[in-house]
């Protein structure tokens, strides 16, 4: 386990009781370096959508716990926000919630010179995802071959 993964896991453990107390869902936690700064980001959601006030409540509690546990030696910026419209799908609960929705899939390696696919998520399990494309064809992808899945944005 990398340090980054260790920090993300510990952050998830600190966030879990805060999420349960407020009936929020922890969508994702990431510890990343961007433009020379480290960021610890928590993406939260709830039925009906998350508000700025919800993010503030979680941020204050989470910040206090992070200060108390002090497991990240680097300076970092804490951000708590909603996952946004084009949220990535990572966990089974994300896929379950998104059944019947249009998704974008990006693969690590191309299939017939194509890495990007789009379609309606029709099924999934631990090993694979299945989508129905606009032309009605069904495609199955091994989860191990998928770099990223997110909800498709239609404007």
From Swiss-Prot:
Record has Cytoplasm as a keyword: yes
Pfam families for the chain: DUF150_C, RimP_N
Identification of the protein by name: Ribosome maturation factor RimP
Organism encoding this protein: Lachnoclostridium phytofermentans (strain ATCC 700394 / DSM 18823 / ISDg) (Clostridium phytofermentans)
Subcellular location as annotated: Cytoplasm
Keywords linked to the UniProt accession: Cytoplasm, Ribosome biogenesis
Main location: cytoplasm
GO annotation, cellular component aspect: cytosol
Gene designation: rimP
Example GO BP: translation
Biological function: Required for maturation of 30S ribosomal subunits.
Xref: InterPro entries: Ribosome_maturation_RimP (IPR003728), RimP_C (IPR028998), RimP_C_sf (IPR036847), RimP_N (IPR028989), RimP_N_sf (IPR035956)
Family: Belongs to the RimP family.
């Amino acid at each position: 386990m990398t340090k980054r993964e260790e920090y993300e896991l510990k952050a998830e453990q600190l966030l879990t009781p805060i999420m349960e107390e407020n009936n929020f869902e922890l969508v994702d936690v990431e510890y990343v370096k961007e433009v020379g700064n480290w960021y610890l980001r928590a993406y939260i959601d709830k039925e009906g959508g998350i508000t700025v006030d919800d993010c503030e409540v979680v941020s204050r509690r989470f910040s206090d716990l992070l200060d108390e546990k002090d497991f990240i030696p680097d300076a970092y910026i804490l951000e708590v926000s909603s996952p946004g419209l084009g949220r990535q799908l990572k966990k089974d609960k994300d896929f379950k919630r998104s059944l019947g929705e249009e998704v974008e899939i990006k693969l690590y390696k191309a299939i017939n010179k194509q890495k990007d696919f789009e379609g309606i998520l029709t099924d999934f399990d631990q090993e694979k995802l299945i989508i129905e494309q606009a032309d009605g064809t069904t495609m199955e992808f091994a989860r191990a071959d998928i770099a990223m899945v997110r909800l498709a944005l239609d404007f």
